[in-house]
Amino acid sequence: MRSITYTLLVGMLACTCISQAEMRDWKDKQGRKIQAELVSCDGTTVSLKLRSGKTVPLPITKLCDEDQSFLNEQSSDIDSDNGDTGAGQLTPPNFAQPWPESIKTDENFEVKTIKEGPDQFIYESPHFKYISDAKLGLQLIRAMGRMFEATYDINKSLPIANKPTRDPQVKFPIFLFEKKSDYIAAGGPPDAAGVQITKGNDPTEPYGHVLVPFESLGVQKVGSGYRMDRAKDFHTLIHEVTHQLMGREVKQASWFTEGTAEYVGMTPYSNGRFALSNNRSSIVASVTAYGKGKENKGRALGKDINLPYSLEEFMNMDYASFTGNDGNTNYGIAPLLIYYFYHGDGTGDAAQIKAYIKALQKGTPEVEAQQLLLNKRTWAQLDDAISKFWRRAGITLKFAKKQVSQNE
């Protein structure tokens, strides 16, 4: 069932684009009134400007049903210039928002039981549906859901307009397995902590689903119930959930798809909080050594990295080659490129990669969209810029020179 909160969110975000705000009465669920005009909404809080000129914040869930309906009626078409279709279906893109320094998810989010037994147990948090083959308490679902909801929040907050996080009607399915053998039987890789699976154009799962064994969440059976190790390293699961939160139209290139997931997965996370302000050191540690976590999950490429392919070849590598014999290396190089385009290219405002993402969202082919990343540079010049950037962080990154055939 589509919740009124989601409907309100779409309406309010769309209302921020209205050219003329009007002074009107606003009422909360307790019947208290203020007269104000709508200023903006960040997705959780609406800003209202009082007659005095003071702007006050109000949680969107506190508004009365009448005001929620009013806001929904005010919703306008999503800006088609950003590649979105379906008026009112997606919240507006957030490309203009500042890069977040940290993300802390609300610990008081609602969890509820949808179905219990006999062989399937379904629970929900605000943005995820958990389908488990064993009964779990709501307290455990809340503890476990904190990581999933925080991953949703960071992907929504990155100013790259992740389309699935802007879809107010979706709950992302997470399948939980008490036994690792059942996880494998359902399609989970034996050596992976979890996996995201997309089933073609299945309308019931527009963004696929994630398979996770209990052990990857640090969930252990204790007596007749379960408990969770909150100190567990969730890098792989955060990586896979990030895949689920990326629109299909941007998943054309292996380097971008995997690099984006690794960028989020390598960002320091603890108890519902992502620290982005110092994630460069964490990414460097995860790529060059074994990371900063206690489980030693890093690529261990060292700080002198010589690659057998050119930058252009790497950024156009098919998925089979990307995950093949040099997979560990490729998974390490991809987040270095992502970090450069997010924070090191040009003035550090991510302008070129945002243009690239916008182009992909409009259906532009990958090779054509890459011209926006090049930004009138040759591949050699871009290679040099990336190498110089990482040299300042103590990493020597050397791509091979592209081999030009005699027929070219």
Please describe what each predicted stretch is.
Residues Q196-V212, K232, K251-E408:
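Acidic/His/Gly-enriched intrinsically disordered linker/tail segments
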Residues V46, R248, Y269:
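Basic nucleic-acid-binding interfaces
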Residues I18-E124, K129, Q139-R142, R146-A150, ...:
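Compositionally biased alpha-helical segments
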Residues P118-A253, P365-A369:
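Juxtacatalytic substrate-recognition/specificity segment
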Residues M1-T5:
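Positively charged n-region of N-terminal signal peptides that target proteins for export
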Residues M23, Q35-L38, C64, Q68, ...:
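Extracytoplasmic/secreted envelope proteins and their assembly/folding machinery
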Residues Y6-T16:
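Bacterial N-terminal signal peptides
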Residues R51, F177-S181, H343-D345:
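Short, flexible beta-strand-to-coil junctions
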